[in-house]
Design a protein with these regions (language model features):
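Hydrophobic transmembrane alpha-helices and immediately adjacent juxtamembrane helices
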Residues: 1-246
Length: 246
């Protein structure tokens, strides 16, 4: 294991342990958040299942929003956090690439998000009439592939907003708005003239019956574009001086 790979491993481990410590210290806040998300998930699924959408599809949409939103938020907020504590320069000089650092942080966040989503699913399974056995039984390989590709695209957006955080200070508010845009674009039908805009939102592609190979290509294109935009933002911020300012 090389020095830089070891450094990334310790970043993942420390981030996971820190999240565990936060979970213990702020357990009440986490419980309230899980209850709120459980209620939102139930209301969305109950409302749209009456419009003919399958339970498996609705669960997949909510999963994309829940995990994808956390991925994007974590990647953008990590930059602001490290700048605030004055550790961004150290990471920049000692980790192979900031892109790798953000990827590791996002993987840790995704793991926790999946665990929390499992808790939400358990709550809905125990206390509502929603049958998760039916949902999982009806979920097709295509559904799983769409979820994976949507989360890959979310990584691209995470890099994009992280790059903006290197240059601008007030990016977190836009990230929050974009998170709800993901939710809106997946569940709400929009006029055809806005279809191009919703197509830019991860996970909304399936409503247009996009072939799976095109979905895969689009998600990888989003990831590449986000990666490149972050690299450009990094160069601009180091030359312009915003990289070194909190």
């Amino acid at each position: 294991m090389t020095r830089r790979i070891r450094a990334l491993y310790y970043i993942f481990k420390s981030d996971f342990v820190r999240e565990l410590a936060d979970l213990k210290h702020y357990s009440f806040n986490y419980v309230v958040g899980i209850i709120n998300q459980s209620i939102l998930c139930y209301l969305l699924i109950d409302a749209f299942s009456k419009k003919g959408e399958t339970f498996a599809t609705l669960i997949g949409k909510f999963f994309i929003w829940y995990v994808g939103r956390d991925l994007i938020t974590e990647m953008a907020s990590s930059i602001n956090e490290e700048k605030h504590f004055g550790t961004l320069e150290y990471i920049y000089l000692n980790v192979h690439k900031l892109e790798s650092y953000l990827l590791v942080k996002s993987l840790s966040t995704a793991l926790w998000s999946v665990l929390f989503f499992a808790v939400i699913s358990g709550i809905l399974f125990m206390y509502t009439s929603l049958d998760y056995h039916v949902a999982l039984g009806n979920m097709q390989p295509r559904d799983i592939a769409v979820i994976v590709f949507a989360l890959v695209a979310c990584l691209g957006y995470g890099y994009f907003f992280a790059g903006l955080s290197l240059i601008f200070r007030k990016v977190s508010s836009f990230v929050s708005i974009f998170g709800y845009l993901i939710l809106f674009a997946q569940f709400i039908s929009v006029d055809s003239k806005y279809s191009v805009l919703t197509f830019l939102v991860p996970g909304a592609w399936d409503k247009y019956q996009v072939p799976l190979n095109v979905t895969a290509g689009v998600s990888l294109l989003f990831l590449l574009a986000g990666w490149l935009s972050f690299s450009v933002s990094l160069k601009l911020s180091t030359k312009g001086g915003t990289f070194w300012r909190a």
